[in-house]
């Protein structure tokens, strides 16, 4: 009778262990789908153009975001965190488009949501364009999305880590880095938002070909307006 009780207890413990393991595996698999990701609300031109931005430098000044694209359109990176090595990798990749963007007459800008110490200064070597401060984080909305501990169990995040590490990019942990960033290609005047990429997980970059294709539409629109 005693042996039977021991066997039942052992079987029960094994069942609990197997069940817990199965639940953990199922949780990890589910975490690698888009089910738990923050929902994205697309920005509108009206929402973005009245955003108050600030220049970064010795004599900062305030201006409306629409000044960035009013005449020639713009490609704008909303940086999750300047010290993040994944963001630096993305900025470096985006900067490879600068010669083509210059030919199209389309400027390249970056937006940060905070300016801590020398973080923007240390980010600048990776980004071939001007950087501005969006203190209210408008470019990260209308619905700000965060990635918390979920990022640690997503295979895509670890693949992005590995890619950036292999590329030789380094960073730090200074500043807020949970609110996800994105990328915008905005046409001149009231042409509108031609491309909007929202980072769905750490290191989720915009497709550079899509960015350049959208920028070419700005060039055509500007040329038509000038004729």
Curated annotation (Swiss-Prot):
The active site is at residues 84, 87. It holds the Pfam family AhpC-TSA_2. One of its GO terms (molecular function) is antioxidant activity. InterPro entries: PXL2A/B/C. Keywords: Antioxidant, Cytoplasm, Redox-active center. Its main location: cytoplasm. Residues 13-111 are annotated as: Thioredoxin fold. GO terms for cellular component: cytoplasm. Transmembrane segments: none annotated. It is found in: Cytoplasm. CDD domains: PRX_like2. The keyword Ribonucleoprotein does not apply. It comes from the Eukaryota. The keyword Cytoplasm applies. Belongs to the peroxiredoxin-like PRXL2 family. PRXL2A subfamily. PANTHER family: PEROXIREDOXIN-LIKE 2A, PTHR28630. The active site cysteines correspond to the redox-active cysteines of peroxiredoxins. Involved in redox regulation of the cell. Acts as an antioxidant. This is Peroxiredoxin-like 2A.
